[in-house]
Amino acid sequence: MARLNRNDPQLVGTLLPTRIEADLFDLEVDGEIPKSINGTFYRNTPEPQVTPQKFHTFIDGDGMASAFHFEDGHVDFISRWVKTARFTAERLARKSLFGMYRNPYTDDTSVKGLDRTVANTSIISHHGKVLAVKEDGLPYELDPRTLETRGRFDYDGQVTSQTHTAHPKYDPETGDLLFFGSAAKGEATPDMAYYIVDKHGKVTHETWFEQPYGAFMHDFAITRNWSIFPIMPATNSLSRLKAKQPIYMWEPELGSYIGVLPRRGQGSQIRWLKAPALWVFHVVNAWEVGTKIYIDLMESEILPFPFPNSQNQPFAPEKAVPRLTRWEIDLDSSSDEIKRTRLHDFFAEMPIMDFRFALQCNRYGFMGVDDPRKPLAHQQAEKIFAYNSLGIWDNHRGDYDLWYSGEASAAQEPAFVPRSPTAAEGDGYLLTVVGRLDENRSDLVILDTQDIQSGPVATIKLPFRLRAALHGCWVPRP
């Protein structure tokens, strides 16, 4: 990386690249790590290994997988590049060969037809596999301990979709993994593929359908009997790609569509409901009661990324604020509208839950929160990826319990670890990486969910800074 534009808002603060592959044995710990925390906290971070081209976005950096391995009160850290086909080509060339975000028509001719995914968004674990994934391609399998890249993963040839969401859903009752691929037949196509994979890695259900219009889709929801697909007006366009323009455009005049499909239904059975133009990056949980479906999610008025707008309006950050919201869908109603209720006004994102209680009406959710009563150490461009606080949302009280990370600090997406396999919902610990911006390094903090406001029970210190990650997961030791 010979040159780096340090005036680029996507390359400063918590977003400043580090590009560090590391092996750290027995990290320094302040406090005491709870004995029940034995396993691995995996994270995935976009890291540009070469200087990005002029028209770039933070979410297009190469995948950098990292892992905190916990064992009997000790923690080791490891980070490795996800060695995709794209990473390998640019490593050999020592320069950027891939152009605009998800636009192959802007690439160097030497990489025409090469798999463009950077596998940088999430780490998932299922049927003994650890996978790095981004929604523009198929996952890459990693070694669970060393994080070395094993290769592109298509479920042993069972998955023919060209893409795979970074937010598959795990059913704790059956062990099934449910996921979709959008633009499943290639960039800017309206095709959706939907799969169910059993706990042994066998595809037990597959169906295809088309979106009402081709659109960017990031997350979805499942209940015991239904899968729900939100289609929102961040549209894609092959003609825009060929004209070497950004792939996405915000077209609010199209409104939003919510597809409701029986969990093992065929694409022809999907029912499309309507909603106004809005945006949802992430779902907390969904459940059903009788003929009603409830979905807790993070909703904003517009797409939080400043892609072009069909109405030529400037990007409005105040409309891009995600807030905890509940959707209610009545399947017995003749109306094609959904009911939407805002649960809280604070900026909040990157939600997780106690996944043992998925598919039922959960009490608790855990997420990054910007508490407006406290100072912010991060800038506008960082606001989807870093937060001044962590929050525990309590559906019974209708409010957050908050932990403030500090005046020169920024917390990231948490992971939840139950206190024991049989612990009550939400009883356990939150793990989160915190950037110490004034020290140019990071900590991993452990918070007790029973008393989050008292601060960390343990702080694991890193001697360098970790770039803001997107998503990860906790995997207990067998």
Swiss-Prot record:
Swiss-Prot/TrEMBL induction comment: Induced by eugenol and isoeugenol.
Name of the molecule in the record: Isoeugenol monooxygenase
GO BP, sorted A to Z: carotene catabolic process
Cofactor note: 1 Fe(2+) ion per subunit.
Top EC class of this enzyme: oxidoreductase
Family, as annotated: Belongs to the carotenoid oxygenase family.
Keywords (A to Z) from UniProt: Iron, Metal-binding, Monooxygenase, Oxidoreductase
pH and activity: Optimum pH is 9.0.
Temperature dependence: Optimum temperature is 30 degrees Celsius. Activity is lost above 40 degrees Celsius.
Upper lineage: Bacteria, Pseudomonadati, Pseudomonadota, Gammaproteobacteria, Pseudomonadales
Disulfides per UniProt: none
Pfam families: RPE65
Cofactor: Fe(2+)
Function: Involved in isoeugenol degradation. Catalyzes the oxidative cleavage of the side chain double-bond of isoeugenol to form vanillin and acetaldehyde.
Gene name per UniProt: iem
Species whose genome carries this gene: Pseudomonas nitroreducens
GO molecular function (one): metal ion binding
Application in biotechnology: This enzyme may be useful to construct bacterial strains producing vanillin economically from the abundant natural product isoeugenol.
